[in-house]
Each structure stands twice: as C-alpha cells, then as structure tokens.
Amino acid sequence: MVYAIVKAGGRQEKVSVGDIVVVDRVGGEVGDTIELTPILLVDGDKVTNGKDLADVRVSAEIVRPEKGPKITILKFKNKTGYRKRQGHRQKLTRLKVTDIA
C-alpha cells in the first residue's frame, strides 16, 4: 500500500490515492488540480523522506469548498451589562487525492 504524509492547509495529513481530505481553504476553482507538499512517502517496506522527496509529486483535485461547524464566542463582564456574542465558521476545501508519483 502506497501512502504519503503531506502538508496541506497548515496541517499534516496521511493520504493515499482516492482519499478525500478536508483542509483549510485552498485557492482555486472546483476541478482544478493542485500539488501537495510531501513530507514522507511509504511504499510497502520502502520509506522515503528528506532530499529523496524532490522527485515525488502528490496531486489532488478540488472537489468543493465548504464551511466548518459554527462556533459561538461569548464575552461577558460582570456587573456592567456588557455581553458580546460572535459566531465563526472556518472556510474549508474538500480535496480528492488523484496521484502519488
């Protein structure tokens, strides 16, 4: 089984061909192909890392942009009546790994 550890959206993800990964927002349109930065490649018993990864390419296709779950931020100060409520939804991108070469 071939898999790679790639850096995508500020995090490291373990991916193999056909996997769908959700990462922080990546620029591009739906259907575009992007290159992910490989950190480690495992092919059966053979492990590749460091300078040997210069030839390794991990390609992924942008499936769709989406948003994460809504979180609520509350601020409160005692005895003053100060209350502040704010929401946030992280922008994400769903990627499908198409090739590890």
From Swiss-Prot:
Q: Can you supply a Gene Ontology BP term from the record?
A: translation
Q: List the NCBIfam families hit by this protein, alphabetically.
A: L21
Q: Which family does it belong to?
A: Belongs to the bacterial ribosomal protein bL21 family.
Q: What is this protein called?
A: Large ribosomal subunit protein bL21
Function statement:
This protein binds to 23S rRNA in the presence of protein L20.
Kindly list the GO molecular function terms attached to this UniProt entry.
rRNA binding; structural constituent of ribosome
Q: Which UniProt keywords apply?
A: Ribonucleoprotein, Ribosomal protein, RNA-binding, rRNA-binding
Q: Name one GO cellular component term.
A: ribonucleoprotein complex
Subunit-structure text? Part of the 50S ribosomal subunit. Contacts protein L20.
Give the originating organism. Answer: Beutenbergia cavernae (strain ATCC BAA-8 / DSM 12333 / CCUG 43141 / JCM 11478 / NBRC 16432 / NCIMB 13614 / HKI 0122)
HAMAP family in the record: Ribosomal_bL21 (MF_01363)
